[in-house]
Amino acid sequence: MGQKTNPTGFRLAVRRNWQSRWYATKKDFPKLLEEDQIIREKLMEKLKQASVPRIFIERASNRVRVKIYTARPGIVIGRKGQEIEKIKEELAKLTGKEILLDIQEVKKPEIEAQLVAENVALQLERRIAFRRAMKKAVEMAMTLGAEGIRIQCSGRLGGADIARREWQRKGRVPLHTLRENIDYGFSEAHTVYGKIGVKCWICKKESDNN
């Protein structure tokens, strides 16, 4: 039986780059890896409203450069840059290192797989019908120039007693072709019936690779 691998990990060094880019000795590696995870968790928690699909981290000696991709840069930067300065201070206190923040705007959030998955999960939490939420996301992505999209919801859909899996697809989503630009996102909806997992695969055009 065929199993799906993570499209991001599958395409590393072919179509995708690592989200943490630094070198460390065997002794320091676990500590820095844990630090990266703490930075990401802190930022994702703080910037929940800013639509952040991914965060890149680079290191050089005692300096950490954090590149935040966001659909709403105004929320991250804040009035007169107040928010960004607060974030810098918090991360510097957390890591004990100099923090450099780089904010990159996501031009088309409707074709960012992580943001699409989070949006569908949010709608499920607001008790919107799962088929309607998926259909709307699929149509929006195709309208904005995606080559193809597939969205899958798993769990007690519609409050059913037995958990099941349903999906919708439009266009082409060739998961086995390494040269294709496949974006992948995952989110969870916390409903009164339990968790519902939302997965999203989007096949993008070359021009949409940001």
UniProtKB/Swiss-Prot annotation:
It comes from Opitutus terrae (strain DSM 11246 / JCM 15787 / PB90-1). It comes from the Bacteria. The gene is rpsC. SUPFAM superfamilies: Prokaryotic type KH domain (KH-domain type II) (SSF54814), Ribosomal protein S3 C-terminal domain (SSF54821). Keywords: Ribonucleoprotein, Ribosomal protein, RNA-binding, rRNA-binding. One of its GO terms (molecular function) is rRNA binding. One of its GO terms (biological process) is translation. PANTHER family: 30S/40S RIBOSOMAL PROTEIN S3 (PTHR11760), SMALL RIBOSOMAL SUBUNIT PROTEIN US3C (PTHR11760:SF19). Binds the lower part of the 30S subunit head. Binds mRNA in the 70S ribosome, positioning it for translation. Belongs to the universal ribosomal protein uS3 family. HAMAP family: Ribosomal_uS3_B. Part of the 30S ribosomal subunit. Forms a tight complex with proteins S10 and S14. GO terms for cellular component: cytosolic small ribosomal subunit. Residues 39-107 form the KH type-2 domain. InterPro entries: KH_dom, KH_dom-like_a/b, KH_dom_type_2, KH_sf_prok-type, Ribosomal_S3_C_sf, Ribosomal_uS3_bac-typ, Ribosomal_uS3_C, Ribosomal_uS3_CS. This is Small ribosomal subunit protein uS3.
